[in-house]
């Protein structure tokens, strides 16, 4: 039944489920909810679960958890950035078969059916706002030093109030749209966009709207050291590609928040060669809540067949583009057609 396109009344409906069966990755139990009005019927499936942090340890339904996660981009060798329900089903099935239990929607909210399928298949999800300043920052870069890079990165976007509306709005749209999905256990403010007053505002709104779910933002560590920032609404200390010694140092000297590897073991070439070392570290301390491998699939476009019948894939300048990432988009655990790389087999074994 199609609605007539107008909101007649807005409000909150409360109902109680006595002794609900709790949703988790091993038993992703869902309840069917049907909302009926004279002009519209909405059917949804929802789940119940709890999220808590105590002594820098994350608990789901009262049980300590480890994120065995992977970063996933929308990518299909035939349809590009548009991924179908069947393609996502293929991805999720392969992930389950290779012992993943979590996905980061790097670096943007996915189609609604992705989350519905994660609810059903039993994946914990980091839902990430579509905020990415890695590229725009290059417009402002002067002398290429760490100090100048981090200072300008903050000053020009993250710490410029002119960007507040754009940043907060994207976070709000994500949270409002996806708030009822049990698979989402964490909100991410975006990717590689530094830190400043705009992200403080986004975090504060998120925590006030949804105080239970975890908040994370790896770029919070990129800051202007001349300014004191507020990190009270940030639940995790997350890093990309830290050495094992850096993790040990954090746990020994600080450790006040759970440590998350939001990206690690970059899977280009032999990049996944240190899975076992990181897994030993992850399971060594309960404050290490796990990590998300970079990344799921190679990004390339199918471009016909070679004489031997094998598919030809184009990427990194193969279409004559001047600006491109060379082979840097070929860094997945699976080929574009989802055949496993050796790295995926190693991950399952570890």
Regions found by a protein language model. Give the residues of each.
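Active-site neighborhood of glycoside hydrolase catalytic domains
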Residues: 120, 155-256
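Hydrophobic faces of well-ordered beta-strands that scaffold small-molecule active sites
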Residues: 68-70, 103-105, 125-127, 185, ...
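Acidic-and-aromatic substrate-binding clefts and catalytic sites of carbohydrate-active enzymes
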Residues: 103-112, 192-197, 223-225, 245, ...
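Catalytic metal-binding/acid-base residues of hydrolase active sites
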Residues: 108, 130, 190-194, 211, ...
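Substrate-binding clefts and catalytic carboxylate motifs of secreted carbohydrate-active enzymes
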Residues: 168, 183-187, 197, 207, ...
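Short gly/pro/ser/thr-enriched loop/turn and capping motifs at secondary-structure boundaries
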Residues: 132-140, 222-224, 267-268, 299-300
């Amino acid at each position: 039944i199609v609605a007539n396109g107008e909101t007649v009344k807005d409000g909150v409906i409360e109902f109680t489920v006595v002794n609900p069966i709790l949703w988790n990755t091993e038993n992703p139990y869902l309840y069917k909810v049907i909302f009926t009005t004279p002009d519209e019927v909405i059917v949804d499936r929802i789940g119940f679960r709890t999220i808590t942090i105590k002594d820098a340890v994350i608990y789901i339904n009262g049980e300590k958890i480890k994120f065995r996660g992977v970063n996933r981009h929308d990518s299909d060798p035939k349809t590009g950035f548009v991924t179908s329900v069947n393609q996502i089903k293929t991805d999720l099935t392969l992930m389950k078969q290779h012992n993943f239990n979590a996905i980061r929607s790097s670096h943007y909210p996915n189609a609604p059916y992705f989350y519905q399928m994660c609810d059903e298949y039993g994946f914990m999800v980091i839902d990430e706002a579509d905020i990415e300043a890695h590229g725009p920052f290059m417009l402002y870069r002067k002398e290429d030093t760490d100090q100048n890079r981090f200072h300008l990165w903050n000053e020009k976007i993250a710490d410029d109030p002119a960007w507040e509306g754009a940043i907060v709005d994207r976070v709000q749209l994500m949270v409002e749209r996806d708030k009822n999905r049990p698979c989402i256990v964490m909100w991410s403010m975006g990717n590689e966009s530094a830190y400043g007053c705009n992200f403080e505002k986004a975090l504060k709104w998120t925590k006030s709207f949804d105080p239970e779910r975890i908040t994370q933002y790896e770029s919070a560590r990129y800051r202007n050291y001349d300014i004191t920032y507020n990190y009270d609404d940030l639940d995790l200390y997350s890093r990309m590609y830290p050495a094992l010694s850096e993790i040990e140092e954090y746990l020994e000297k600080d450790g006040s928040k759970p440590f998350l590897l939001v990206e690690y073991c970059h899977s280009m070439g032999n990049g996944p060669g240190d899975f076992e070392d990181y897994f030993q570290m992850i399971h060594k301390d309960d404050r290490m809540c796990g990590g998300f491998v970079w990344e799921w699939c190679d990004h390339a476009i199918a471009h016909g067949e070679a004489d031997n019948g094998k598919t030809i894939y184009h990427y990194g300048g193969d279409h004559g583009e001047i600006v491109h990432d060379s082979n840097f988009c070929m860094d997945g655990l699976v080929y574009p057609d989802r055949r496993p790389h050796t790295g995926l087999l190693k991950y399952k074994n570890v």
